[in-house]
């Protein structure tokens, strides 16, 4: 079963449908685009006309999903953080295949002791294995964006340390990495 986030006018949707998924769900917030998708793909997809930030993805299907998305760049880190923080031991997906703004992807895959390493690196690699697939130039899109993009694949880790409240990790990393240039003791004052 497949879930696509933000299908827009359905370009990626059409390609995914060629693979004949058992079930295909899409989450599209825009009412006009949802109507367009409904007309274009009829009963081939299940449209969830809602905001991805307000949905419990684990309630969409009893099966584990393969998730595709060219995430809206302005909320991509918020979406990813939400998914990671809300993950239980039983993951609701097999893999996430997601497009990010290249700068964001570089922060997600950054190794420790590098300038890009921070909150997103820690959160993403806590429960997930992350692999960079390809950088994509603006010329590959229509309309052409002003920035480069990167495709990443996330798969569940078999072993990760459990936290009583995962939001604490998000909060602590946000505090520490928002003040990179200041002394480490400052956040504790």
Predicted feature descriptions by range:
Residues 1-167, 171, 175:
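Catalytic cores of RNA-modifying enzymes
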């Amino acid at each position: 079963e497949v879930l696509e986030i933000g299908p827009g006018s359905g370009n990626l949707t059409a390609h995914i449908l060629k693979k004949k998924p058992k079930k295909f769900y899409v989450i599209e917030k825009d009412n006009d685009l949802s109507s367009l998708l409904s007309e274009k793909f009829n009963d081939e997809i299940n449209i969830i006309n809602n905001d991805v930030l307000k949905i419990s993805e684990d309630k969409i299907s009893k099966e584990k999903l393969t998730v595709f998305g060219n995430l809206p760049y302005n909320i991509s880190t918020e979406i990813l953080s939400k998914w990671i923080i809300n993950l239980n031991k039983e993951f609701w997906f097999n893999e996430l295949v997601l497009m990010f703004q290249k700068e964001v992807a570089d922060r997600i895959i950054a190794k420790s002791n590098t300038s890009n390493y921070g909150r997103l690196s820690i959160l993403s690699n806590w429960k997930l294995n992350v692999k960079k697939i390809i950088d994509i130039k603006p010329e590959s899109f229509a309309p052409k964006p002003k920035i480069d993009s990167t495709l990443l694949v996330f798969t569940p880790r078999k072993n990760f340390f459990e936290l009583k409240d995962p939001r604490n990790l998000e909060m602590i990393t946000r505090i520490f990495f928002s003040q990179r240039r200041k002394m480490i003791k400052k956040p504790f004052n």
